[in-house]
C-alpha cells in the first residue's frame, strides 16, 4: 500500500514545485569587465546607448550578471556553447542587459553595458 502512495506523492511534489517557479525565470551569465582604460570605469546605462542616463560604473575585474538579452536579437544562451573568444566576437559591438545593484542597497535593476569591454567569466 505504501509503495503505491510514493508515485502519487512524487507527482504532487513536482506539480507544487513547478507552480511556484517564477514565470520567465532565466539563467544569468557571468561576464567580467575588461580592457577599460587605466583610471576609467565601464558605465552601465539605463538604455542601450552611450548618451543614455548612467546608472553606475564598474572597474576592470568586476563580474556582472547579464540577463542574456542583447540588442539585435542576440541571446547569450544561443552562443553559450562557443569558445570564449567566439563569444566575445559575437557580442563585441553590441549592448547587453545586466542585472545589478548600483547603489549597493539591495535595490536591483536592469541596465545596459557595451560588450566591447566585457569577457566571459
Describe the predicted segments one by one.
Residues 9-17:
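Bacterial N-terminal signal peptides
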Amino acid at each position: 500500500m505504501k509503495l503505491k502512495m510514493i508515485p502519487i506523492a512524487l507527482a504532487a511534489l513536482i506539480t507544487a514545485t513547478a507552480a511556484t517557479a517564477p514565470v520567465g525565470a532565466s539563467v544569468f551569465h557571468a561576464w567580467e569587465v575588461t580592457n577599460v582604460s587605466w583610471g576609467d570605469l565601464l558605465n552601465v546605462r539605463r538604455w542601450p546607448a552611450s548618451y543614455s542616463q548612467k546608472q553606475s560604473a564598474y572597474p576592470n575585474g568586476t563580474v556582472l550578471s547579464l540577463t542574456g538579452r542583447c540588442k539585435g536579437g542576440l541571446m547569450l544562451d544561443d552562443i553559450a556553447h562557443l569558445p570564449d573568444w567566439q563569444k566575445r566576437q559575437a557580442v563585441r559591438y553590441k549592448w547587453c542587459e545586466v542585472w545589478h545593484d548600483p547603489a549597493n542597497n539591495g535595490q536591483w535593476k536592469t541596465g545596459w553595458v557595451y560588450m566591447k569591454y566585457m569577457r566571459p567569466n
